[in-house]
UniProtKB/Swiss-Prot annotation:
The keyword Cell membrane applies. It comes from Levilactobacillus brevis (strain ATCC 367 / BCRC 12310 / CIP 105137 / JCM 1170 / LMG 11437 / NCIMB 947 / NCTC 947). This is Putative membrane protein insertion efficiency factor. Disulfide bonds: none annotated. It is found in: Cell membrane. InterPro entries: Membr_insert_effic_factor_YidD. Coiled coil: none annotated. GO terms for cellular component: plasma membrane. Keywords: Cell membrane, Membrane.
Length: 99
């Protein structure tokens, strides 16, 4: 079942998504998140995680980095985003040490 769902998402990515401008507020995109969630967590949990992500992807949310977590959850992966932001701040400090 998981492979069939991934096949449908890949079809969307290839044939439907290019017809519209990019609107996803997250990285990875919602469709890529769905494929990764299906691959990592199976058909049922992966579908639920992907649908929860799509529902979070709306204009009133700031978006950002939101990778698929290693454990099942319907919430945003805030730990990964915080680690990414901290790494980017350290990188910025190293590039501009006199700020």
């Amino acid at each position: 079942m998981r492979h069939i769902l991934i096949w449908f998402v890949r079809g969307y990515q290839r044939f439907i998504s290019p017809l519209f401008p990019p609107t996803c507020r997250y990285y990875p995109t919602c469709s890529t998140y769905m494929v990764q969630a299906l691959s990592k967590h199976g058909a049922l949990k992966g579908s639920l995680m992907g649908l929860a992500r799509i529902l979070r992807c709306q204009p009133f949310v700031r978006g950002g980095i939101d990778p698929v977590p290693d454990h099942f959850t319907l919430k945003r992966n805030t730990a990964a985003e915080a680690a990414y932001r901290q790494a980017m701040q350290l990188d910025e400090i190293e590039r501009h040490p006199h700020k």
